[in-house]
Amino acid sequence: MAGTYGDEPEYRLDSVGLPDFAEAVLGIVDQIPAGMVLAYGDIAEVLGQGGPRQVGSVMSRYGSSVTWWRVIRASGEAPEGLQDEALAHWREEGTALVRGALAGRRVDMELARWDGEGMAN
């Protein structure tokens, strides 16, 4: 059961049934420190393949086993339908939130975007 993402190469299932691309995405998510975030596109950029939509697809299918609330839209918003749960995690971890009109319901990307320091390859 291999799949393709547009013009992206075909990703094969590994021995535990997880596509290689998904395994790579989740491996990065596992490294994001508490209180920090990455946008979907940031993860694709680190991997050098796919794009925000492909990373989002992986997160929607396989992300429940990782710290999914640390992977957000470039605007600082949580995944659709998970805003309240993400907000609770962000507050618990001390993630920097935008003040003002959105009443802290959006991450301050300038302050909370992880720079990848210490990321394993």
Predicted regions and their residues:
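Nucleic acid-binding interface residues in structured DNA/RNA-binding domains
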Residues: 2-121
